[in-house]
Amino acid sequence: MEPERAHLVIWQVGTNSAIRRIPTDQFAARLRAGIDIGKSLGANFVLMNLQYVPAVVALPDEEEYARVMAEVAEEKGAGLFRRFEIMRSWYNDGMPYAQFVTNDGLHLNDFGQKCIGKLLSMSILDAVNPRRLTGAPNTPH
């Protein structure tokens, strides 16, 4: 019996690379290679970009990693879930980090994970069923 292959890969990436100060050209090359391997096995990709958390925001070039991810996603035909921008909007709208980040300043707490999970699920459903966005009836042709 052959193992089932992944149809969709959601790759949470960028946070550790940014913190470890991986040069962005190397980061981009690793993204391309990973997507190429997965696509060669028949998987579709969604890149989930880095987290907007104190450990990342303190870096001098955190937005450069988000930019590189967007470029590679477009180049490789992968989806991009903009977690960085979503979390930044929470913070800019007055939500304190403590409400969605653990005490280590790096990882999402249960509330943050739940919110990101729901938004990601809705994004995937909207991508595979655009009629959800328009309210049009979902009738087969």
Predicted regions span which residues?
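Alpha-helical cap/lid subdomain in secreted, periplasmic
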Residues: 1-141
